[in-house]
From Swiss-Prot:
It catalyses: carbamoyl phosphate + L-aspartate = N-carbamoyl-L-aspartate + phosphate + H(+). This is Aspartate carbamoyltransferase catalytic subunit. The gene is pyrB. L-aspartate binds at residues 99, 184, 239. It comes from Pseudomonas entomophila (strain L48). HAMAP family: Asp_carb_tr (MF_00001). Pathway: Pyrimidine metabolism; UMP biosynthesis via de novo pathway; (S)-dihydroorotate from bicarbonate: step 2/3. One of its GO terms (molecular function) is amino acid binding. NCBIfam families: asp_carb_tr, PRK00856.1. GO terms for cellular component: cytosol.
Amino acid sequence: MTPFDAKRPLQLNDQGQLRHFLSLDGLPRELLTEILDTADSFLEVGARAVKKVPLLRGKTVCNVFFENSTRTRTTFELAAQRLSADVISLNVSTSSTSKGETLFDTLRNLEAMAADMFVVRHSDSGAAHFIAEHVCPDVAVINGGDGRHAHPTQGMLDMLTIRRHKGSFENLSVAIVGDILHSRVARSDMLALKALGCPDIRVIGPKTLIPIGIEQYGVKVYTDLAEGLKDVDVVIMLRLQRERMAGGLLPSEGEFYRLFGLTTARLAGAKPDAIVMHPGPINRGVEIESAVADGKHSVILNQVTYGIAVRMAVLSMAMSGQNAQRQFDQENAQ
């Protein structure tokens, strides 16, 4: 674990409700299940002619993305809008941070504008945790991805995808394949799978892209794709994160595809009803071939749909927990 793994008291209020969503580390199975159940209920909202519920009416959600991600930002915006919140998305490249204003000052100014919640994405591990603990403790903070550390909403939308296609986690074999070393998605998925009772979690990749000590997550390590995929129920493919790599970690993208790219032939080693997932963006012909990404085993587009519902669940639950804590503090101050 990194030193930034979220402490339970910071993420939960005194009643055990979610108030920030920073990491899946330390969160109990019951809370993860509540998030999944709540997200399931929000899937129905997305099927309506009018895709809105009034749970966050009058609240302001600020998306503060210091690292680009069109898919994540858009699904958070849709989630907040479907909850009837007012949404501000800060374009950091044109904001005052590019003029020398610090992260601290930027967020304090947004808080002064009566923001109720921040969705933060940052290239530094621990950024969301720092903001929740030291910058804006009275504003609900949702981690939209921080460095290599965590991407908890992606982890939960992956769990919702698995649960809706496979039911219980307790008899599943799940393989996570690719650049494990640089992937915050891999870390969040491993934590969630372990907490939800998955007995067989496998990570597959070249030795140079598997972190030392990863066994502490309760996973089995494979450096041979065929061996690692044997009889699995779920395959989660990850892209090569070149932007986070130092030189020499792998020979070439072509070499990676030759050894670890998911093809129809290689997928045949998994169970016949295995599902294939990918957090995106997909690099076709690098970690996965088009015939698999677009084939009958792929649930990649389902992940996008479920992501909106999961983010609706997290936003609504964190806002409720933050409000409950504020009321609790006021009552105890009297």
